[in-house]
Amino acid sequence: ASGSAAASGATGTYIPGTYEGTAEGISSTVKVTMTFSDSAVTDVVVDTSGETASIGAAAADELRDQLLAAGSAEIDGVSGSTITSEAVMKAAKSCYAQAKGEAVVSSVQLPTGDENDWLGTEPDIDEAAITETVDTDILIVGAGNGGMFAAAYAAANGLNFRIIEQNGNVQDTRHWYGAIDSAAAKAAGEEPFDRAKLLSEISRYASGKCDQRVVKTWINESAEMIGFVREIMTEKYGVNMIYTYGDEAKWPAENAEHNTDFMYPEIEYTYDRSSGAARNELLLQYIQELGYDVDFKTSLAKLEKNSDGRITGIIAQSTEDDHFIRYNANKGVLLACGGFPGNPYMMEQLDPLGTSVTTACSYSPADKGYGIRAAVWAGANLDKEAAPMLFDRGIVAPGVDGGYVDSDTAFGGKAFPGTIRQYNPGTQPFLKVNRNGERFANESSPYNDIVYAAAHQPGRVYAQICDANILEDAKRFHTIGCSAQTRNGGEKYFQGKVDEAVADGSL
């Protein structure tokens, strides 16, 4: 989007010329190009084409108009496009600084590495560039699901902590989560689960490629976690908890006749989203009411450690003005930075199989694995095998293959071809065939099984075949977990998913 006008200042304010600024948006590098006379901005070009098509990318014209009208980089932004708007403002600030002859501090590009070396090199930051110091006992890096849980618990116990987040808001809430033998389970009359058997089953399902100590921690402490969250969500903010148990939490018995006899612990919890409340936002409100807050727009640059190898804190960077901040954490640093689905370098090199069969993703594009890289730079041991969570819902048009396609705007020059976040009916175990019309796997399986089976088929994709009785069949299949939305949502929900796929050209 481009446009011309004259946002004026005093004569001689600017060095006439055209300047370019960039900043990381939610899924791409946002670029702003501004032309200055000696007293005014005469032209602005905003390129957000790599952002989400219907959100950030669509906001380019309005953001350009705001920059032209404001005569500065301080604009209101576009509602619903917060991260893209902030990136545009940051890029515009760089243009203004250049036009005024000011030194522009170059930021540490957090998504480092390349197609041959996913890790890249730890940034070398000059001490003179560190202009702020924060002392705390505990530092939490990342205000997503893990980070906000940790922050809420720390706040409830009056601990001295800080929490930072590279974006301008808390990250998406994962509404479904699990716990063993909670108070809700006891109230529903559920018998205590065989914890030793569950530990063995989870290890078997992972082919033994797991740390059973971590699994055991979840088994033994998840009920306490659920109780703590319920105190906040239900008792404090009045958001009801939904517990899935009984027959609703199990596949039909006939499924085991010619299939794996899975275990079905009643572990599924979520909160009523019809209230409009997102758990992470309420957790933010909770810690704020206790006198804490999140240091937003603050990115991890590197971990620091002493001569004994102990982590003592981090160096962070403000994503607003690029100044560096040292956080000294006397008792420790908790990394809650998520994975690396938004980084094709890491995806292809660390998980080539999962990458090859993926068509569409419902991940955060800002999740580029920087916390993992920083930990490895500091000496952490990285699991030798990736553990992706794949859903069988990445609907794409006929003829589209699984895996990356080239992209001029996405980070790393690659993106997955699908544009629909999740086509929930895709999980239903209807007939699934390859491009030759051949059935190739048992469709009644956990989410990722059919996806991996497609790795051996043409294009690494398949077609799902069903008829007009899909809702009746979905009730009979009685799949569980979040796939139950197709069954429980009824005709309105299903038709909405179909209409979205038809409009997208995928169905």
Specify the residue positions occupied by each region the protein language model found:
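An anion/pyrophosphate-binding glycine-rich loop and adjacent beta-alpha core
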Residues: 372-374, 381-507
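A short, basic/flexible loop-to-alpha-helix module at the beginning of a structural domain
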Residues: 114-135, 437
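Active-site- and interface-proximal helix/loop "cap" or "latch" segments in soluble metabolic
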Residues: 9-109
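Glycine-rich FAD pyrophosphate-binding loop
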Residues: 155-174
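Beta1/beta-strand and adjacent pyrophosphate-binding region of the FAD-binding site
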Residues: 128-146, 162
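Glycine-rich loop(s) and the adjacent beta-strand/alpha-helix scaffold that form part
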Residues: 320-323, 327-401
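Glycine-rich active-site loop/strand segments that organize a redox cofactor
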Residues: 180-218
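Conserved redox-cofactor binding core of oxidoreductases
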Residues: 219-323, 344-345, 395
